[in-house]
């Protein structure tokens, strides 16, 4: 067998290589994997970590995905929908406080009222976030489930800036049996993996940056399944990846299957992040909030293993308890103003820095679409200080206090 250090120097990996790396468990081997992935990240993507301010628009959902705490048939959840003013207000706050982009997430709905509601929000967010720092307005990621192509196109037009428009829709598992386990409740509406892939094709045709991902540690999942997931990422030619550990939900109907031992699940999730970074290289990878549900510093460790995106929760505190896809979701009692400050400190502790006022589009997307010019990254200390100073000032120019101690 090839020495691990030699394997980690490769630029191409066989399926056997991937399975071997995913299965690493000893502290020494995992440290070597982490170092290789961290180096790959900073060499290819730079040292910045990009924020996607998460706005959990609504927990009303028409789907019955069996793993999910806000599934339609969970009648213990108090349903809510933020108002248009609340959603736009949070997006404007994000733009004024240095966030380059926001993510609107909600349960899946395809009714005309919801589609029009999101359309109005997108138009207003674009119009109300254009500024000197963000001349195209704040970047937008949507995570609103499977939709028709006409809906994707309507939302793309409403966004005002397709170049900085993203859509996140995870296929959860490339194994049809596992996908069925997660999404098909007896006698209920059924999800179809092929239709999910059709949505991906429509999204690209409409000009979105495509984001997808999987659950890690699904009951019955194998390392070979995860390897096939990685190969599917390549085949789909995705721009960003959001994946995290499978965590049971008391609101779902799979809780009797349990979940992996937390320590083992954490390491497998980190290994998956690292291997995806080594294999795909130039995509954006999010450090999932679910990692923090296992360990308080889970997202920071995810950054060490190859992630370069985090999603601070900007949802008003009063809504957070109603949007729990899994048990023990962190930060339920925090307000949006606490998240950015806290995360910047955590990111700095791992030798990285926040990309304030930057869209943070992946290098893969820019290459795929022929955009040779990379988003401007200030090189001198003076330029960096000037950019940070802009991010530190709120709408009336008052200075916000952040923790900025990363060496440059």
Q: Which positions does each model-derived feature cover?
A:
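Auxiliary Fe-S-binding modules of radical SAM enzymes
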Residues: 1-28, 95, 234-408
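Active-site glycine- and acidic-residue-rich loops that bind
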Residues: 142-149, 215-230, 289-296
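Glycine-rich, proline-tolerant flexible connector loops at the mouths of alpha/beta enzymes
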Residues: 52-55, 75, 103-115, 247-257, ...
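Short, charged low-complexity linear segments at domain edges
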Residues: 29-50
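Conserved, mostly hydrophobic/aromatic
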Residues: 37, 65, 104, 203, ...
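Core AdoMet radical
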Residues: 72-88, 94-199, 209-216, 239-242
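Generic structural signal for well-ordered alpha-helices
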Residues: 53, 91, 118-126, 152, ...
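Canonical Radical SAM [4Fe-4S] cluster-binding loop centered on the CxxxCxxC motif
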Residues: 43-86
């Amino acid at each position: 067998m090839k020495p691990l250090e030699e394997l980690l120097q490769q630029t191409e990996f066989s399926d056997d290589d991937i399975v071997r790396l995913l299965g690493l468990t000893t502290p020494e081997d995992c440290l070597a994997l982490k170092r290789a992935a961290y180096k790959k990240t900073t060499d290819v993507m730079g040292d910045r970590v990009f924020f996607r301010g998460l706005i959990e628009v609504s927990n009303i959902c028409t789907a019955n995905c069996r793993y999910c705490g806000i599934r339609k048939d969970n009648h213990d959840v108090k349903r809510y929908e933020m108002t248009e003013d609340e959603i736009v207000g949070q997006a404007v706050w994000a733009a004024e406080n240095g966030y380059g982009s926001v993510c609107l997430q909600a349960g899946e709905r395809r009714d005309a009222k919801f589609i029009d509601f999101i359309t109005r929000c997108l138009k207003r967010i674009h119009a109300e976030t254009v500024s000197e720092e963000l001349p195209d307005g704040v970047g937008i990621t949507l995570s609103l489930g499977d939709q028709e192509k006409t809906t994707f196109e309507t939302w793309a037009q409403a966004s005002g800036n397709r170049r900085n428009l993203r859509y996140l829709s995870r296929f959860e598992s490339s194994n049809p049996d596992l996908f069925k386990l997660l999404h098909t409740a007896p006698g209920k509406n059924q999800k179809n993996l092929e239709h999910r892939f059709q949505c991906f094709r429509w999204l690209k045709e409409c000009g979105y940056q495509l984001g997808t991902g999987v659950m890690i540690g699904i009951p019955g999942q194998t390392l070979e399944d995860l390897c096939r997931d990685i190969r599917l990422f390549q085949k789909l030619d995705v721009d960003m990846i959001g994946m995290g550990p499978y965590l049971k939900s008391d609101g779902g109907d799979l809780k009797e299957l349990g979940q992996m031992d937390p320590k083992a699940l954490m390491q497998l999730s980190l290994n998956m992040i690292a291997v995806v970074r080594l294999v795909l290289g130039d995509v954006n990878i999010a450090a999932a909030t679910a990692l923090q549900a296992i360990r308080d510093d889970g997202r920071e460790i995810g950054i060490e293993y190859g992630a370069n995106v985090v999603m601070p929760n900007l949802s008003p505190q009063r809504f957070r308890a109603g949007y729990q896809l899994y048990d023990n979701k962190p930060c339920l009692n925090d307000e949006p103003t606490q998240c950015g400050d806290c995360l910047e400190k955590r990111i700095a502790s791992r030798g990285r820095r926040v990309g304030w006022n930057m869209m943070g589009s992946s290098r893969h997307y820019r290459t795929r679409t022929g955009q040779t010019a990379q988003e401007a990254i200030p090189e001198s200390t003076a330029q960096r200080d000037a950019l940070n100073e802009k991010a530190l000032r709120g709408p009336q120019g008052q200075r916000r206090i952040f923790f900025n101690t990363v060496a440059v």
